[in-house]
């Protein structure tokens, strides 16, 4: 799928507008506000970093596999919910300052929506380990339990009429192979 | 519960060799080891009777006639079900005997398997 | 004669429906009560007769080719018992909601919602065809949604309601699978037809299992049940303990003859039930929210019912447990509702304690309900739970599953004792000057009625139900006492642990408790992992590749650009020079000529 995306992206770049895939949702933006093409040379890299107000060491665009966002920087996924509420933000509701580069999905990471950087009491990996461990342990033990069944020291229940051959939906025209007979124990 | 746990232990660790398999239970000839042939278990109710009385499938066993008697008594004395405690007891006793019969079958199978085991080991020693 | 009684029963229900539209809310409660009495009479008439089931109405609604959709009501033992239990419990809960919701401005609407739910539930249990079952099923689902989000201004309640309806939709897929498969393959939706055909189909049965798991909150689809506790307490009491959540088990009971013919599905349902009963019991152990403990114990008991339907193959016992469970669990919820209301909406058990002096009658009812839930001998729960444990013990079943059921049973006692210790017993830890008062007729009355029924219902039902399977008559004493024994052990352990953990000098925060307190991390992980996976896939393939890739290139967004390029070329060619046109003409003619020669 990435290959298809890359093909489409390359096609767009080569013979359409020479722009990256970031098109439709920002159609209203002017050309200067659009992210530029993926930076190839170190100079372009530095220029892109400067454009977004970042240091070159911090700047890292999305990989250019056809589904990237041009030179837009790949920022850490932080929801507004987990930002410090006591900081004097320029925008207190969205908890961001003027000139901050927003995450490319920042519309999904507002305070009413999802928070990808949620802090849990128990670490995430530990939680998964606990749940998978619980279910997996029980699953394995149920498998072994199926091998070693709970054994009650009685014979299977005996039923008359060939073990209820007809009642259990047997074919009346075709008699069962051998007739099952049950015997009493002698009275002592 | 303790009895069952110890039995389970025996079935899988202590006496693995001669614990019967409930899936293929009567593996010996029914008359093997008896002085005279055993009598066949008597089924009193017929298939048609049971079908007419709509006896549940699990209860169409050798006590079905007593179950049917109980149910008929219930129907006749419906609001006063204490009137049927005699029939209820009869059926319960029959089911109890059936359970004991199942236990006996199990024990017979177990002892025969043990005996077979013993015989085999004796033959091995003679050789 | 029998038909007459059936018609009377349906008429009483019809009158109940009419009273649903009355302006006076208590008259609806009265009508529910009298409908309950009428149906109790019907039940005894049915038991007296020789019939095991009756079909009413038999009205042909739609006729499509060879298929005809019949509307009829199936009145068998299960339906009649459930009618009586459901109407009795609903009547009490309606009276209780007059107390609990008395300050709510829309209490009339609330009672109408409860009534609509009741009608949907009765449709569900008396359904004769899968289609009617679907109507009742979706009816209870939507009423559950509306009632959980009753306090719609609270975002928690909204979230819980959405969770409930989403998880229920997953289960409904199973029901739709059943409907479609049976219509396409068998051309019949009626239960009579499905029973008579005696088919065994994995696809259909997986639908049954999925539907039951969704509605009855089995492991995997369970998080909505504890979340649904955000709704008002009468809702939790009616929908999420006694009636709606058992609809899944009821479906399994209806289809148990088919399930028991399929070994793999039977095993699957058995494992699902045992794992649910253990998981929910573990989660209930460390909850501090009073209603959540009761909710998890409900889920645990539902797991026990599912276990016994499939594992031991005794659907009648499961049904008995449904009836018993309805009485005492509805009462437990009402008691906790009374406590919560008296303590000004305080649900945290750590802030309760010593309520036996503040609210003695509620406390006694709470104790009776917990004892019945634990299976203390000769209360209602004992008569269903003890045979369940016994029948699981005397069958050659999966040994680990048997152990899990026993552990879960002991946990039942553990969390019940813990809850009792925290709320009713001990020293009072509530805020001072709480106007704790239980002198309301609409609180005490329903509680007492349900308490009496929790005591005697077991005897009555055992007395009237004719057994469908062999009762265990010759157990060794130790095995006979197994259920009581594990209950006792669980209770003692709970007592010990509570004393250990909640003294002043003790360590109260044990990290190992996080698994129990955070309900096994299941909702946290699943509610994050699955949406995240789908979100990433959506971003990758739908947004970047399709919307911003190929749509830009060739599809609507790209068409404009492509046409613009072509149009630009055409415009560029329009130079008004005759030589240019002639050149183009010659070129085209040469091309056509060349093609013709080549061909």
Swiss-Prot record, chain C:
Superkingdom per UniProt? Eukaryota
Q: What is its EC number?
A: 7.1.1.2
Q: Where in the cell is it found?
A: Mitochondrion inner membrane
Catalytic reaction equation(s) = a ubiquinone + NADH + 5 H(+)(in) = a ubiquinol + NAD(+) + 4 H(+)(out)
Gene Ontology biological-process annotations: ATP synthesis coupled electron transport; electron transport coupled proton transport
Keyword Transmembrane set for record: yes
The answer to whether keyword Ligase applies is no
What is the annotated signal peptide range for this record? none
Quote one Gene Ontology molecular function term.
NADH dehydrogenase (ubiquinone) activity
User: What is the enzyme's main class?
Assistant: translocase
Keyword tags: Electron transport, Membrane, Mitochondrion, Mitochondrion inner membrane, NAD, Respiratory chain, Translocase, Transmembrane, Transmembrane helix, Transport, Ubiquinone
Transmembrane residue ranges: 1-21, 28-48, 81-101, 115-135, 171-191, 193-213, 233-253, 265-285, 302-322, 323-343, 363-383, 398-420, 455-475, 481-501, 510-530, 577-597
Record's bilayer topology term: Multi-pass membrane protein
Q: Name one GO cellular component term.
A: respiratory chain complex I
Role this protein plays: Core subunit of the mitochondrial membrane respiratory chain NADH dehydrogenase (Complex I) that is believed to belong to the minimal assembly required for catalysis. Complex I functions in the transfer of electrons from NADH to the respiratory chain. The immediate electron acceptor for the enzyme is believed to be ubiquinone.
What the record says about family reads: Belongs to the complex I subunit 5 family.
Q: Which PANTHER family match?
A: NADH-UBIQUINONE OXIDOREDUCTASE CHAIN 5
Its protein name is NADH-ubiquinone oxidoreductase chain 5
What organism does this protein naturally occur in? Answer: Branchiostoma floridae
As recorded in Swiss-Prot or TrEMBL, the protein's gene is named ND5
